[in-house]
């Protein structure tokens, strides 16, 4: 049936709109937003309201675009000072953790395939490992979204470690998936070929991501565009240039865009705030489209025959394969990472869109059992998002790994672009501060430091040196540079609490 472009746009917009409304309902009950998008697609799909979508190729290509932009945005939001202490364990989790999860889970699937479950599910050893490989990585979109939407403040640098793992482990899962598909199609691949492929993918991916990221920063800061909105479009172009260039050089494009995102996000960048806002919007749109599309792609009635196998695999992966892989991967770090932290890392093995996208590769390659692989991976993803996603904050609290969120109230709504090179701090006027002086000129502020605005109740005051301060006033300081400013304020009063920090 031919559908006009107007009808197609109307249906697409309506689906996205309904998904957003469903996500609001799910948020009230603690259901992950991305799970609601997935369920919305299933509701409107073939077994629901009857919208037919069965083009695996289109789903794979849209997923590829999403898996370029989402990790790049996550990389831009990752601060090097946060991940530097957890860089080594994060890399171990993203490499050996994925490999061990594939090995343990693949052997379990092969063992289960020998059971007489009357489900029609049966895999060879390579096929079992392929199924495990497609879902061996945690999903960056799901982990970034859940950690940030639930506003969990984790101890022991766990949040940057988890975001580093989820942002950088897709390349390993992708590589294992491709190699195992080649093994099934060609009848075998030599060990040297596998080792060379691993080295080439990671070395070219890391080097290409870093070098092209540095080149992107240099070009953005020097191009001198008259229209500020074009900088965001330029960054979007760089994302795809980086991915495709590294891919053509036989490197891992997904790893490259994540590395490039970290390089760009941790550099002085013209219009960084505007670029970040644009990419955040793009990330949300792609997450909605990707999960909604994957929900439309699956036929729930086809998952019923594999349901028992999928549940067994999900339970084994969650409670055996993932924890065992985490413990073994983190052995070199001894007691630096506590057992409670390892337990929580094991629980945050959330599956999402990436495993489902990787499960489309066997379908496109037409390997034996590809449809079963896709349906099992989809079912495991549903279980993971539902149980692990919903219980994330509860598990963190039970393990004693949370701490109160720092207050981030913004009373002034003022942000500075990075090229200004100044720092804003919001400070509460306390008794201790008033003991140093009741007027601004008595505070002995260093050169270059100004009180640019005061909030008193509901009033905003542009102060001068003779203004008398009152208990409860909120002072907005501005100073060029950061460290000297912090030392100055600490010198004024050790009891002052910093409530707002904005340095872009």
Regions found by a protein language model. Name each.
Residues 362-363, 400, 443-445, 468, ...:
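Short, solvent-exposed amphipathic alpha-helical segments in soluble enzyme
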Residues 78-81, 270, 300-301, 436, ...:
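Short beta-strands and strand-coil junctions in structured, solvent-facing domains, enriched
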Residues 467, 487-504:
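Short, compositionally biased
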Residues 404-424, 496-504:
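Long, charged amphipathic helices and adjacent flexible linkers at domain junctions
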Residues 433-482:
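Cytosolic Rossmann-like ligand/nucleotide-binding regulatory domains
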Residues 1-409, 418-419:
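Transmembrane helical cores of multi-pass secondary ion antiporters/exchangers
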Residues 396, 471, 484-491:
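Charge-rich, low-aromatic oligomerization/scaffolding segments with amphipathic character
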């Amino acid at each position: 049936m031919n559908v006009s472009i107007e009808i197609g746009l109307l249906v697409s917009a309506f689906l996205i709109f309904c998904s957003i409304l469903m996500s609001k309902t799910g948020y009230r009950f603690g259901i992950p937003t991305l799970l609601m998008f997935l369920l919305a697609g299933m509701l409107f799909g073939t077994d629901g309201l009857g919208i037919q979508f069965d083009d695996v190729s289109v789903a794979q290509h849209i997923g590829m675009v999403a898996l370029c932009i989402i990790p790049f945005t996550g990389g831009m939001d990752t601060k090097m000072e946060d991940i530097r202490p957890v860089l080594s364990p994060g890399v171990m989790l993203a490499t050996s953790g994925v490999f061990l999860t594939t090995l343990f889970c693949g052997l379990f699937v092969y063992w289960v395939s020998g059971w007489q479950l009357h489900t029609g599910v049966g895999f060879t050893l390579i096929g079992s490992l392929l199924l495990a490989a497609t879902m061996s990585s945690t999903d960056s979109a799901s982990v970034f979204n859940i950690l940030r939407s639930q506003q969990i403040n984790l101890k022991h640098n766990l949040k940057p470690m988890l975001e580093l793992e989820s942002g950088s482990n897709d390349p390993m899962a992708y590589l294992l998936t491709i190699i195992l598909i080649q093994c099934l199609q060609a009848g075998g691949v030599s060990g040297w070929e596998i080792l060379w492929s691993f080295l080439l993918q990671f070395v070219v991916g890391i080097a290409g991501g870093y070098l092209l990221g540095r080149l992107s920063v240099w070009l953005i800061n020097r191009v001198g565009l008259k229209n500020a909105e074009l900088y965001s479009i330029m960054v979007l172009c760089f994302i795809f240039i980086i991915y495709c260039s590294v891919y053509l050089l036989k490197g891992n494009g997904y790893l490259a865009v994540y590395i490039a995102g970290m390089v760009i996000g941790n550099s002085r960048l013209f219009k960084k705030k505007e670029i970040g806002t644009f990419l955040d919007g793009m990330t949300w749109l792609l997450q909605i489209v990707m999960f909604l599309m994957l929900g439309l792609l699956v036929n729930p009635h086809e998952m019923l025959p594999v349901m028992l196998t999928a549940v067994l695999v999900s339970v084994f992966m969650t409670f055996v394969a993932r924890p065992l892989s985490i413990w073994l991967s983190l052995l070199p770090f001894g007691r630096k990472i506590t057992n409670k932290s390892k337990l929580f890392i094991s629980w945050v093995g959330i599956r999402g869109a990436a495993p489902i996208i990787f499960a489309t590769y066997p379908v496109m390659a037409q390997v034996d059992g590809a449809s079963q692989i896709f349906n099992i991976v989809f079912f495991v993803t549903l279980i993971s998002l539902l149980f692990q996603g919903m219980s994330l904050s509860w598990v963190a609290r039970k393990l004693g790994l949370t701490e109160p969120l720092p207050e981030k109230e913004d009373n002034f709504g003022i942000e500075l672009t990075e090229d200004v090179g100044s720092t804003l701090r919001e400070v509460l006027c306390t008794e201790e501060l008033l003991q140093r002086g009741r007027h601004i000129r008595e505070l002995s502020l260093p050169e270059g430091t100004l009180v640019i605005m005061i909030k008193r109740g509901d009033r905003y005051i542009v102060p001068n040196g003779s203004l008398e301060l009152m208990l409860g006033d909120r002072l907005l300081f501005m100073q060029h540079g950061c460290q000297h400013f912090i030392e100055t304020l600490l010198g004024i009063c050790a009891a002052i609490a910093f409530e707002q920090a904005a340095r872009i």
